[in-house]
Amino acid sequence: MGIAESTPDELPSDAEEQLRSGEQQLELSGRRLRRLPGAVCALGRLQKLYVSGTGLRELPEEIEELRELRILALDFNKLERLPDGLCRLPRLTRLYLGGNRLLALPADFAQLQSLRCLWLEGNFLRRFPRPLLRLVALQSLQLGDNRLRALPAELPRMTGLRGLWLYGNRFEEFPPALLRMGRLHILDLDRNRLGGFPDLHPLRALRVFSYDHNPVTGPPRVADTVFLVGEGAVERMAERDEPTPRPRARRPAPPFEDEEEEDLLIGGGGAGTLGRPGVSLRALEAAPGLGT
């Protein structure tokens, strides 16, 4: 029995088989589903829930009953708002909300203090969601393909952030707050409206910087250990790698703290993807020490 043949509160038969296998994981992706079956919220021991590309329009407040949930994939649906109940999942570490219709996040979103990976690409966000500023454990933040024009001055409060994707937004100037994000490993500003860059040497941990498809005439000033993607990047990296009569020892960029951090930044662990397709993903694969 497929999901389209089930009542809104029933689990499809194959989903029940998934649970009987002993794995605390439920895969509902790709089914026709306007709302989450009520029976799902009764699965109090569930740890991973995938509901991607179903046409989902709403979530029940009862989703807060999934107290053991670690991974929740809701990308490529039709969600316009999130219930407060979603903000009360104490163990949630990875949340995928890309490709929906979100204009904002609930104020209680800041309660997701275990969250380490958040993907919000392809929504309708015009302002940086301020509840995110309180998520100090967040490591990977995907905000590509939204409508952002500025970043809050308080952004450096997010001391755990290591990867920040801002491609496909509406930035006309390099956001000053980014210069105080000294722990960032990956920064993607591809496809914006940037006409130039400040000196990026203050970003001491930076390993990959993508600025392609902006109206700039050349690469920014960065440390020699940074892998660049954009106009003039290949030439710049070739120049700095040429041997000199008195070569200086180059200190390698700080490595990832552990394999889990690398997985969060490069793979994301979400719904079978490695990240957004395109030049920046290729850059990550090519960058020394960053390939998967």
Predicted features and spans:
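Conserved active-site motif detector
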Residues: M181
